[in-house]
Amino acid sequence: IDEMNKLGILIDLSHVGPKTSSDAIKFSKKPVAYTHCCPMLKKHARNKTDEQLREIADADGFVGFASYTPFLPKGEDTTLDDCITALDYLINIVGEEKAGIGTDWVQDQDIHFFNYLSYDKGKGRPTSTPHKKVPSMPKG
């Protein structure tokens, strides 16, 4: 973290758990970010709790809202309005100046790629049920 701070590299905590996030937020001398995540409106290992979001905002960090439908409450039925509702929820926690868009969308990949993404720690621990089809963009 010291070397990243020294070199001006943004520390992205989107893919790490609560303890690592908290430790990095406390240790870093510069603001850190969740560049692409969702608030815990749906229980998912990659989503962040209100407490985690407040902690990063209190340390002048940034949170990018991910419109990745598997992380959102309605899944494949997520609409653009649902994304706006979730983004508003995020803004109410971290503030307008510390929230943005971090879509986290990957294109031109097959179902095997998305199922690979559903694992944490290699193939040792799935964080969600396997995808039956390639996730879609929000509707509308």
Q: What positions do the PLM features span?
A:
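Active-site gating loops and adjacent loop-to-helix segments of metal-dependent hydrolytic enzymes
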Residues: 1, 31, 111-140
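Histidine/acidic residue-rich metal-binding segments in metalloenzymes
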Residues: 1-33, 45-61, 81-97
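Active-site-proximal beta-alpha loop/turn segments in soluble metabolic enzymes
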Residues: 1-7, 32-38, 67-75
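Active-site beta-loop-alpha junctions enriched in small/polar residues
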Residues: 9, 14-21, 37-40, 68-70, ...
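Short, well-ordered secondary-structure micro-motifs
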Residues: 24, 44-46, 75-76, 111-113
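A conserved active-site cap/scaffold subdomain adjacent to cofactor or substrate pockets
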Residues: 57-80
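Short acidic/histidine-rich active-site segments
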Residues: 66-67, 94-116, 131-137
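Short amphipathic alpha-helical interaction segments
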Residues: 75-82, 91, 139-140
